[in-house]
UniProtKB/Swiss-Prot annotation:
Residues 861-874 have a biased composition (Basic residues). The modification Phosphoserine is found at S453, S682, S749, S753, S793, S799, S1099. Keywords: Metal-binding, Phosphoprotein, Zinc, Zinc-finger. GO terms for molecular function: zinc ion binding. This is Uncharacterized protein CG5098. It comes from Drosophila melanogaster (Fruit fly). A zinc finger (PHD-type) spans 1151-1199. Coiled coil: none annotated.
C-alpha cells in the first residue's frame, strides 16, 4: 500500500500520494488506540501521512493552534518550515506507510521523524496540545474549510492540489529538512511525523480523559505559543501524546484525528475554549489559513504574522473575498466555528502529515463516535477540518504555482473548495451565530478533512469523518459545544468534537475497529455529502455554490459544499440556515468546506455531522430518515456488509459508475489501510459515525466493506446521501478539485444516490481496491470533479430533478464513470504517467480483479473503475483517460447542457431514444454513465410541428383593411380618413345620422354589372378601350391594393371635407342639370352611366370608383351604411351573408345622384317618366318619400302627387318614366300601363 501511496504521492498529484499516505495513516492510526507504543508510533506515522495531506493546511493549523498573533507569526514561520517539514515528513511517511504495512517499528521510526518535525509542547499539556495542535490544524482547517469554503475553499482547493503536489515534491526533495516548513508554525504542523505523533498522543490523551483534552484545549492558546517556538521539531510533543498512552487507552475509540479535533478545540479555547475559540481560534485559524494560503501562494513563504486572532479573522475574511475563497471560508469558519478553526489547524497538520494524520482523524472519529462517553475526541474533529482547509490552502497556493500535477490537484481541490465555499457561507450564518458552533464546526471541519483526504488519499477523508463524528458527538454534547465551551474544556472537547466522534468509535479501540469506524464515518460522510448535495437545493438560498459548482474545479467544491448543505437541509433544513442549532449550523458549515476540500465526501459527512451536531447519532440517523429511499438503496447495497453500506454511502452518493470507479481506485490505493481500518471497524460504530466516516475518510470508505456490519446505520445515512445523490449529480463536477478520496465519496454520490445497488457494487469495489492499492483512489479523487454536481446546481432543484434512467443501476454507474472521468482527466492524468501511475495501475488491476465480482452488480460502477483506473493506472491508458475526459468532462459537465450526450454517443442508444420523447425537460442517464439534460423535443416532434398543414392562403390573407370601423379601437374620430366613405352615398361614418360604416366587403369586377357599368350600348369599344386604358393604368394603379382607386387629380377633392364637397356639388347640380355631364341636353333623370362613360370627363370615372379600395386586380374593398345597403335593390341578407353586393355596387356606379352629382345613387323615384336617382341620405335631406312599409321612393317632386302614388301602387313594376309619360290616363287598367312599359 505504501508503494502505491508513494508513487501517487510522488508521481501523481500530491493529493494522490497524500491519499495513499492518508490510507496508510488510516491503517496505522486506527490501531493506534489498541496498538502498543510501537504500534502507536506506527499509527503516528500513518497519522503523519494523513497529516501530510493536512499539511496543505499546516500553516493554518499552526496559526489556529497559536491563539496569539505571536503564535500566528511563529506559525507563519512554521508554515514555511512546515512545507519543508511536510515534504520530509511525507517522504518519511511514505516510507513509514510502507513500513506501517510491513512492521510497526518502521512506522515508529517514521513517527519519530514526524515527531521530530513537530513543535515541542509541554509534556502532558504539550502532548495533549501537540495532538491538539494537530487536531486544531485539521479541525481549524476543516472548520475553516467549512466556514471559508465559499471563498477560501475555492482558492485553496485548486491551490491545495498544487500545494499538495508541492508538498509531495517538497518532502521528496527536501527530505526531512523541509519538516520545518511542513510545520507552518502550528504545533502539530511542526512536522508531518510530529503531527501524527501528536495525533497518536492525542488519541491517548484525548481518549484517556476528556479533562486532558479540555486541558489541552484550554491550554491551546498557550500551547499554540508552545508550537510557535519550536513547531518543526518537537519530538517531546509527539511523545507526550505517545507517552499519553494511558490517554489513548482511556479513549481508545478516539482516533488520532478525533484527538486532533478534540484537542484543537480544547487547546484553542481552553476553559472558555468555545468562545475563545470563536475569537482566538477563528483568528488563529484565519492566520493559519492566511499563512497557509499565503504560504501556498508564495510557495514556502508564509505571510507575515496575521493580524491578531480577531483581526486575522477579519483579515482572512477579507482575503477570501479578494483572491482566496479559502480565506473567506476560513474566516467564516473561524467566526462561526472556532473549534472548527482549531480543527482546521489540526487539519493543516493533518494535510502535512496527510497519510497518517488523515487516517488517524478518521479513526479518532470512529472512536469518538463509538464512545460517546469519550468527550476528548473533540480534538480529532478539529484535526480533520484542518486537513481540508490545509488542502484548500495548499490548493490555493498550488493554484498560484500552477504546477501541472498540483494544478490538477488544485483544480480538484478548488472544485471541492467551491462546494465548501458555498456551504461555508451558509455555515457561517449558523457558526457565527454560536461560538460553540465553532467547535462543532471543528467537528464538521474534521468532516471536511476528508476533502483533504481525497487529495491525500484517505487521510483528509478521515479528518472529515472525524469531524463529522466529532460533530455527531457535538450533537450529543450540544450543550457544551453549543454554548458552554469555556466552562468545561474537557466536556466541550469531548462533547463538541470528541464526544460525537467517540460515540461513533464507541468500542473499537483496535486499529481495525477504528478503521472500520473511520470507514463507517466515511460512509456516513459520503451519505452526508449526498444528503448535503440534494439539500444543496434545499439550502440553495444559502448556497450560491451551485454556480461555483458550474466551474470545473470550483464546481466540485461548490458541489461538495452544496452537498453538505443539501444533506443538512434535507434532514435538517434548518441546520445550515439555522445557526440556532449550534451543532446543526456548525456541522453544515464545516461540511461545506469539507466538501470543498474533499469533494462530495466532505460535504456529505458535514451533513451527517450536522445532523450529529443537531441530534448526535440520531442526527446521522436523521440524515438517513431524511432520505429514506437512499437508505433503502444503501441497505440494498449493504448486502456486502454494514461496511459495504458504509462504502455504499460514497458509492450511493455517486450511484453512477464514475463514483464507483473512483471508489474502487480509492479502495485500491488504501487497500492495506482499509484492511486495517476494516479490522478496526466494529459494528459498535454508530451508523452516523459510519456515514460520517464514509464521507469523512476515503480510507474509512475503503474499509467500508469490512465494516459492513457497522454500516447498517451508516447505510441509512448513505441512503440519505444517495437520495441526495441526484442533487449531488452536479457535485462531481464541483468535486474535481477533490482528491480521489473526495472523488470516491463525492463524485459518485450525486449520480448514484438513486441507485443504491450500484452504490453497493461500488462499495465492494472499494473494498477490493482497499486491499489492492492506493493508486485507484487518485482515480476516484478526480471524480469529485465531475460536472454533475454543478449540473444539478445549475439545472434544477434536486427534489425537482427528473432522472431518466434506461437501466437505473447501469446508468447510475455510467454516471459514476463519467464523474470519475472528468476528475481523473483533470487531476489524475498526470499522476497516471508517474511512478504513482504504475502503482495505481497495479492497484487498479488488483482492484479490478477483486472488485470484478462486486462491480458486476453495478456494471456502471465497474465501468467507472476501469475508466478511472485506466486513467490513473498509467499514461498508457490514454484512451481510457480520453474516454473519461470526453465522457466525463465533456459529457458530465455539458450534461447539464446536453452536450454530454454528444460525447457518449454510444450511450444514447439504449433508453435514450424513448426517453427523448418526454416532453418536459429531464435528465437522461444512459447505461454507459453519460448524463444529459433533455429540454427539447425529439426530432419527430419538431418534424410534426413543421409538417403541420398550413391554412390555405386566403384571398385576403395578405390584405389589410384600408379603414378601421368606428367600432374598432383603432378608430380615430378626430382625424377621420376622407377616403373612408360609403360606396353608395360617398359619406363617411356617422354622417347625416347614417351611423357606422360596415365592412370591409369585397366586390369583384369580374361580373356583368361591372361590365355594364363601364360600357354603354353605343360605345362599347370606345368605352372598353377607355376604361381599360384609363382606369387600369392611371386611376386604379393596378398593384397598389389598400389604396383607394382614385386618381391623384381628385386627391384634393377626396381630402376636402365631405359635407362642403357635397354642398359644392349640390350647388353645381342645381345650377346645371348634370354637373359632370358634358351633354347639356341630358336630363336629370338620365342614367349617370352615360356621363361616366363620357370620354371627355375623367372625373366621372374617378367618381365611379370613389369609396372603393383596390385590393387586387379584380377585387375592391367597399364600406357601406346600413340604410344605403337596405335601400339598394340587389342587396339581400341570406342567413348571415350579404348577397347581391357586387351587382348593387356596380349598378350604383351607373347612376348619379341628382342632388349631390356623385355616383352611387341607390334609390330612384317611382313616379313614371321620372328618372331622378339619389343617395339615401341625399333623398332624405331633399324631402324624398322613403316608405319603409312598402319600400317605395318618390322624389320631392312626386311625393304629393296622388296619381303618381296610385299608379305606382298599381304598377310597381312600371318605371317612373312610363308613369310620368301616361299621367292623363289614370283610369286605364294596369294592363295599359304594363303594355306601355318600354
Amino acid at each position: 500500500m505504501n508503494p502505491l501511496l508513494a508513487p501517487p504521492y510522488s508521481g501523481t498529484l500530491p493529493f494522490n500520494s497524500m491519499d495513499l499516505s492518508l490510507q496508510s495513516a488510516r491503517s496505522a492510526a486506527q490501531p493506534l488506540a489498541k496498538q502498543p507504543p510501537n504500534q502507536q508510533p506506527h499509527q503516528t506515522q500513518q497519522q503523519q501521512q494523513s497529516l501530510i495531506h493536512a499539511p496543505n493546511y499546516p500553516s493554518i493549523q499552526n496559526l489556529t493552534t497559536n491563539a496569539t498573533p505571536t503564535s500566528t507569526q511563529l506559525q507563519q514561520q512554521q508554515q514555511q518550515e512546515h512545507l519543508a517539514a511536510m515534504a520530509a515528513a511525507h517522504v518519511s511517511l511514505l516510507q513509514s506507510s510502507r513500513q506501517n504495512q510491513g512492521a510497526p517499528s518502521g512506522n515508529l521510526s517514521n513517527g519519530g521523524d514526524c515527531e521530530s518535525l513537530l513543535p515541542p509542547p509541554p509534556p502532558t499539556s504539550v502532548s495533549g496540545n501537540t495532538n491538539h495542535t494537530g487536531s486544531n490544524s485539521s479541525s481549524n482547517s476543516g472548520s475553516n474549510n467549512h466556514i471559508a469554503s465559499p471563498h477560501y475553499m475555492q482558492s485553496r482547493d485548486e491551490n491545495f492540489k498544487l500545494t499538495q503536489l508541492k508538498r509531495s515534491f517538497e518532502p521528496d526533495l527536501s527530505g526531512k529538512n523541509p519538516q520545518k516548513e511542513k510545520d507552518f508554525g502550528y504545533p502539530s504542523a511542526s512536522s508531518a511525523s510530529k503531527l501524527p505523533t501528536h495525533n497518536v498522543q492525542q488519541q491517548h490523551a484525548n481518549k484517556k480523559p476528556s479533562p486532558l483534552r479540555n486541558y489541552h484545549q484550554q491550554q491551546q492558546p498557550p500551547y499554540n505559543l508552545t508550537p510557535k517556538y519550536n513547531g518543526p521539531q518537537t519530538p517531546p510533543t509527539p511523545q507526550s501524546p505517545l507517552a499519553a498512552n494511558p490517554h489513548q487507552m482511556l479513549s481508545p475509540t478516539m482516533d488520532y484525528n478525533q484527538l486532533h479535533l478534540h484537542h484543537q478545540l480544547n487547546s484553542s479555547s481552553g476553559g472558555s475554549y468555545q468562545h475563545m475559540q470563536q475569537d482566538q481560534t477563528q483568528s488563529q485559524s484565519h492566520p493559519q489559513h492566511l499563512h497557509y494560503h499565503n504560504q501556498h501562494a508564495t510557495s514556502q513563504t508564509a505571510p507575515p504574522p496575521l493580524l491578531p486572532p480577531l483581526l486575522t479573522s477579519g483579515q482572512f475574511h477579507a482575503q477570501p473575498q479578494d483572491a482566496s475563497q479559502q480565506q473567506t471560508a476560513s474566516s467564516s469558519q473561524h467566526q462561526t466555528h472556532h473549534s472548527r478553526t482549531a480543527q482546521l489547524t489540526n487539519l493543516d497538520q493533518a494535510v502535512k502529515h496527510k497519510p497518517e494524520s488523515e487516517e488517524q482523524p478518521v479513526i479518532t472519529d470512529l472512536s469518538y463516535r463509538n464512545s460517546e462517553t469519550d468527550k476528548t475526541a473533540a480534538n480529532p474533529v478539529p484535526e480533520a477540518p484542518e486537513s481540508p482547509y490545509l488542502t484548500t490552502s495548499n490548493e490555493e497556493s498550488l493554484e498560484s504555482n500552477s504546477n501541472s500535477s498540483n494544478s490538477r490537484k488544485r483544480r480538484k481541490r478548488k472544485a471541492s473548495m467551491v462546494m465548501r465555499v458555498t456551504p461555508n457561507e451558509n455555515a457561517p450564518e449558523g457558526e457565527n451565530s454560536k461560538p460553540q458552533h465553532p467547535q462543532q464546526a471543528a467537528n464538521l471541519n474534521n468532516s471536511c478533512s476528508p476533502k483533504k483526504s481525497p487529495k491525500n488519499g484517505g487521510g483528509e477523508f478521515q479528518p472529515f469523518s472525524t469531524q463529522k463524528q466529532s460533530q455527531t458527538e457535538n450533537e450529543k454534547t450540544t450543550q457544551e459545544n453549543g454554548r458552554g465551551g469555556s466552562p468545561a474544556p474537557a466536556e466541550n472537547n469531548s462533547n463538541s468534537n470528541s464526544s460525537t466522534l467517540y460515540n461513533d468509535n464507541e468500542n473499537p479501540k483496535t486499529k481495525k475497529q477504528r478503521q472500520a469506524l473511520l470507514q463507517r464515518n466515511l460512509t456516513e460522510q459520503h451519505r452526508m455529502q449526498q444528503d448535503d448535495e440534494p439539500p444543496k437545493n434545499h439550502t440553495s438560498p444559502a448556497m450560491p455554490p451551485p454556480s461555483p459548482q458550474s466551474n470545473s474545479s470550483s464546481s466540485s467544491s461548490s458541489s461538495s459544499s452544496a452537498n453538505t448543505h443539501s444533506s443538512q437541509s434535507s434532514h435538517a433544513v434548518n441546520n445550515i440556515p439555522k445557526p440556532e442549532i449550534n451543532n446543526k449550523a456548525t456541522t453544515d458549515t464545516p461540511a461545506s468546506p469539507a466538501l470543498v476540500e474533499q469533494g462530495d465526501i466532505d460535504a456529505k459527512p458535514a451533513v451527517s455531522v450536522h445532523e450529529c451536531d443537531e441530534e448526535e447519532e440520531p442526527a446521522v440517523n436523521k440524515v438517513s430518515p431524511a432520505h429514506p429511499d437512499p437508505p433503502t438503496t444503501a441497505a440494498v447495497a449493504a448486502p456486502p456488509a454494514t461496511e459495504s453500506p458504509k462504502k455504499s454511502s460514497p458509492a450511493a452518493n455517486s450511484e453512477s459508475c464514475p463514483f464507483g470507479e473512483v471508489e474502487d481506485k480509492l479502495e485500491q490505493m488504501f487497500a492495506g489501510i482499509e484492511e486495517e481500518t476494516e479490522r478496526i471497524s466494529s459494528p459498535e460504530k454508530p451508523a452516523e459515525e459510519s456515514a460520517a466516516m464514509v464521507a469523512h475518510n476515503l480510507t474509512a470508505q475503503l474499509a467500508l466493506d469490512p465494516s459492513k456490519t457497522l454500516d447498517t446505520p451508516a447505510e441509512n445515512q448513505t441512503s440519505v446521501l444517495a437520495v441526495l445523490a441526484p442533487n449531488q449529480t452536479p457535485t462531481p463536477e464541483i468535486r474535481p478539485v477533490a482528491t480521489k478520496a473526495a472523488m470516491k465519496s463525492t463524485m459518485p454520490s450525486p449520480v448514484h444516490s438513486p441507485i443504491p445497488q450500484s452504490r453497493s457494487t461500488s462499495t465492494p469495489l472499494v473494498a477490493g481496491d482497499d486491499s489492492k492499492s492506493n493508486t485507484p483512489v487518485p482515480a476516484k479523487a478526480p471524480a469529485p470533479r465531475r460536472p454533475p454536481p454543478r449540473r444539478l446546481s445549475m439545472g434544477m432543484d434536486a427534489s425537482l430533478l427528473r432522472f431518466m434512467i434506461d437501466d437505473p443501476p447501469a446508468k447510475k454507474p455510467g454516471r459514476k464513470k463519467k464523474v470519475t472521468k472528468e476528475p481523473d482527466f483533470e487531476d489524475d492524468d498526470k499522476p497516471s504517467t508517474s511512478a504513482a501511475a504504475a502503482a495505481a495501475l497495479a492497484a487498479r488491476q488488483l482492484s479490478e480483479a477483486a472488485s470484478a465480482t462486486k462491480s458486476k452488480p453495478a456494471a456502471g460502477a465497474k465501468k467507472k473503475n476501469a475508466g478511472v483506473k485506466g486513467k490513473k493506472g498509467s499514461a498508457g491508458k490514454g484512451n481510457a483517460k480520453n474516454a473519461k475526459q470526453n465522457g466525463k468532462k465533456s459529457a458530465r459537465k455539458p450534461a447539464f447542457t446536453t452536450d454530454e450526450d454528444s460525447t457518449p454517443a454510444p450511450t444514447n442508444g439504449g433508453g435514450s431514444v424513448p426517453e427523448l420523447r418526454f416532453k418536459s425537460p429531464f435528465i437522461l442517464i444512459k447505461p454507459d454513465g453519460s448524463v444529459s439534460i433533455k429540454n427539447t423535443h425529439s426530432a419527430e416532434d419538431v418534424n410534426e410541428k413543421q409538417t403541420k398543414v398550413k391554412k390555405a392562403p386566403h384571398e385576403r390573407k395578405n390584405l389589410r383593411g384600408m379603414h378601421s370601423s368606428t367600432l374598432s379601437n383603432r378608430y380615430d374620430a378626430d382625424t377621420t380618413d376622407s377616403t373612408w366613405i360609403c360606396v353608395f352615398c360617398k359619406r363617411g361614418p356617422h354622417k347625416l345620422g347614417l351611423g357606422d360604416l360596415f365592412g370591409p366587403y369585397l366586390v369583384t369586377s369580374d361580373c356583368d354589372e361591372y361590365r355594364a357599368a363601364v360600357q354603354t350600348p353605343g360605345a362599347q369599344d370606345i368605352d372598353g378601350m377607355f376604361v381599360n386604358k384609363r382606369r387600369r393604368e392611371d386611376m386604379v394603379k393596378g398593384q397598389e391594393r389598400n389604396l383607394p382607386a382614385v386618381p391623384a387629380t381628385l386627391a384634393n377633392i377626396m381630402q376636402a371635407p365631405k359635407i362642403s364637397m357635397h354642398k359644392r356639388k349640390r350647388k353645381q347640380t342645381h345650377d346645371s342639370s348634370i354637373s359632370y355631364s358634358d351633354d347639356p341636353n341630358e336630363s336629370r333623370s338620365q342614367c349617370s352611366s352615360v356621363d361616366l362613360l363620357d370620354c371627355s370627363t375623367e372625373s366621372k370615372f374617378v367618381e365611379t370608383f370613389r369609396g372603393m379600395g383596390k385590393t387586387s386586380e379584380n377585387g375592391f374593398e367597399v364600406w357601406l351604411h346600413e340604410d344605403c345597403a337596405v335601400w339598394s335593390n340587389d342587396i339581400h341578407l341570406i342567413g348571415a351573408h350579404v348577397n347581391g353586393l357586387d351587382a348593387a355596387v356596380w349598378d350604383s356606379t351607373r347612376y348619379q345622384c341628382v342632388l349631390c352629382q356623385q355616383t352611387g345613387a341607390s334609390i330612384c323615384c317611382f313616379q313614371r317618366c321620372c328618372k331622378a336617382a339619389a343617395h339615401v341620405p341625399c333623398g332624405r335631406s331633399a324631402n324624398w318619400s322613403l316608405s319603409e312599409e312598402d319600400r317605395k321612393v318618390y322624389c320631392h317632386l312626386h311625393r304629393h302627387e296622388p296619381g303618381v302614388v296610385e299608379p305606382i301602387k298599381t304598377e310597381s313594376i312600371a318605371p317612373v318614366e312610363v308613369s310620368v309619360a301616361t299621367p292623363p290616363a289614370p283610369a286605364p287598367p294596369p294592363a295599359f300601363n304594363i303594355h306601355s312599359l318600354p
